[in-house]
């Protein structure tokens, strides 16, 4: 049986930075930067010990930056079209190269990347990178592409707003002229003629600060300004070039792609390219960042994706429950809406786009994420993802530079992540610099995530929602408690999540249908073990009496019962 996938997302540039006093909007020289070499075998083993099966290294491919790497053979970027001193990892400048920030020796960056792949596999982890298919940096230029590869835009007819074989969309005869300064600290202003459409589908020559102005949209054969008509025959040039890029990285031994803004790229492309890649590399997984539930099945069945973000649905609902403005009852509707595709949904409570649980913009306290973690990680066999520092209660409340004080860890700036830096402790990972609360939270995450693969009932078992027979009463708060069963063979786990800020004695109704459904006998009493504490307790296990138990505040219980 395959493992339940547990992904540890890490923002590669920030993980190993040991600087303690970073300057607002500081340069790499001023603030420092983490490297591939910080992911030692010890570091990777520690990440694996958290329960991780995969690690998603975010920001690996070369992207636009304000740091000059001419000595490494890289053309500098104009600062006016780079977000932050370090730059966004989603403004790719060379699909065939590695971000030089991440290398000890920038000229040897590809070799250092290949060593990291080998090291990751040696630690028993699978290796995931980003694939950013919708847009590239405005000054995209591949210095490292194979000799027989033509660059994006190299053969474009720039007189056509849309041409099926163009790689970009043009605004003919118009200068790129956004409503902000195009010079900044450079000797001369950034110049682009004709202007090209931005990555967020702004087809004008004058995007604003809220647009993805640092990127240009890739053309997959959809004429957006011509009633969105599709022109997929003959095969568009962009399809062929992106296929080759996916095959290039697959040949490096990676195990998966997290595909940025996948639904902004036509599903027909995915349905064409993913089988091509899998024919040669059958074990590679494709994860889609998607936000439109109406398109989920389209991107699974026609687009051939393995997994989709479960953001609009479970994440949004759990966030509401954790913050107190959504009833826990709504969790049932979440799984029901994707029940037929549940194995394809990737659950998470944090990632680089979302605010930290412990931030002032979310729940303020990391403990409030415990109950949500129980639900997100344990209710199905589908994958679970956490974001580096989540397991330590990282607050994301720094005002780093381009990224303001927004409850997120910056993806644009050179910075340090306080909790991660102290956990690493210069590579010792001895927990000596962590607070008692951080140690407790880390242990909780590690225990729960490891249970996901240790316990067959969670890893591969069936699911039974108990909320339909547990309405609010003096024994149960259906707005703050969520209960379900996971079962495999003779092992049954009663999972209880408590989103309340106080401990609670609760009574859970077990319906007769539960026993019929699983073909198990009702018993007056059984002995159960809480997998989170190791404590045993005797409880009722029948449809005539409530199962009474005690649950901690902002937490829960996984009561394992041997049938």
Language-model segments: which ranges?
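Extracytoplasmic/secreted proteins, especially bacterial periplasmic and envelope-associated proteins
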Residues: 38, 42, 112-115, 241-244, ...
């Amino acid at each position: 049986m395959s493992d339940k996938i547990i992904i540890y997302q890490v923002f590669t540039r920030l993980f190993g930075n040991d600087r303690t006093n970073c300057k607002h909007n500081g340069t790499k020289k001023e603030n420092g930067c983490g490297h591939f070499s910080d992911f030692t075998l010890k570091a990777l083993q520690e990440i694996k010990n958290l329960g991780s099966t995969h690690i998603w290294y975010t920001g690996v491919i070369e992207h636009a930056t304000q740091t000059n790497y001419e000595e490494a053979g890289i053309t500098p970027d104009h600062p006016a079209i780079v977000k932050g001193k370090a730059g966004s990892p989603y403004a790719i400048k060379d699909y065939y190269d590695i971000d030089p920030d991440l290398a000890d020796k920038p000229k040897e960056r590809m070799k250092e990347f290949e060593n990291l792949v080998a090291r990751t596999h040696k630690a028993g982890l699978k290796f995931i990178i980003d694939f950013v298919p919708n847009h590239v940096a405005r000054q995209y230029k591949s210095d490292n592409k194979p000799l027989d590869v033509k660059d994006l835009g190299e053969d474009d007819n720039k007189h056509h707003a849309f041409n099926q074989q163009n790689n970009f969309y043009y605004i003919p005869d118009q200068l790129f002229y956004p409503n902000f300064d195009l010079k900044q600290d450079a000797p001369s202003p950034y110049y682009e003629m004709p202007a090209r459409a931005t990555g967020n589908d702004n087809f004008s020559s004058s995007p604003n600060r809220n647009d993805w102005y640092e990127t240009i949209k890739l053309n997959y054969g959809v004429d957006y300004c011509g009633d969105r008509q599709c022109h997929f025959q003959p095969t568009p040039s962009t399809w062929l070039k992106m296929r080759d890029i996916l095959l290039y990285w697959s040949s490096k031994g990676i195990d998966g792609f997290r595909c940025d803004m996948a639904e902004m790229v036509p599903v027909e492309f995915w349905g064409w390219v993913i089988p091509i890649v899998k024919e040669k590399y059958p074990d590679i997984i494709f994860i889609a960042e998607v936000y439109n539930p109406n398109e989920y099945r389209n991107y699974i069945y026609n687009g051939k994706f393995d997994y989709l973000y479960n953001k609009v649905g479970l994440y949004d609902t759990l966030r509401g429950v954790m913050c107190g403005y959504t009833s826990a009852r709504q969790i049932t509707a979440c799984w029901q809406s994707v029940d037929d595709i549940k194995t394809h949904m990737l659950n998470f409570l944090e990632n680089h786009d979302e605010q930290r649980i412990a931030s002032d913009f979310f729940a303020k306290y990391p403990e409030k994420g415990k109950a949500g973690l129980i639900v997100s990680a344990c209710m199905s066999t589908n994958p679970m993802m956490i974001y580096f520092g989540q397991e330590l209660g990282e607050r994301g409340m720094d005002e780093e530079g381009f990224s303001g004080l927004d409850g997120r860890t910056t993806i644009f700036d050179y910075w340090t992540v306080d909790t991660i830096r102290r956990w690493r402790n210069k590579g010792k990972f001895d927990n000596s610099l962590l607070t008692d609360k951080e140690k407790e939270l880390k242990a909780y995450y590690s225990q729960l995530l490891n249970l996901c693969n240790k316990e067959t009932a969670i890893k591969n078992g069936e699911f039974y929602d108990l909320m339909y027979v547990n309405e609010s009463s003096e024994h149960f708060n259906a707005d703050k408690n969520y209960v379900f069963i996971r079962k495999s063979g003779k092992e049954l786990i009663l999972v209880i999540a408590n989103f309340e800020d106080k401990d609670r004695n609760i009574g859970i109704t077990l319906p007769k249908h539960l026993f019929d459904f699983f073909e198990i006998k009702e018993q007056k009493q059984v002995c159960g073990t809480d997998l989170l504490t190791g404590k045993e307790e005797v409880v009722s296990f029948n449809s005539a009496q409530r199962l009474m138990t005690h649950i901690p505040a902002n937490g829960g219980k996984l009561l394992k019962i041997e049938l």
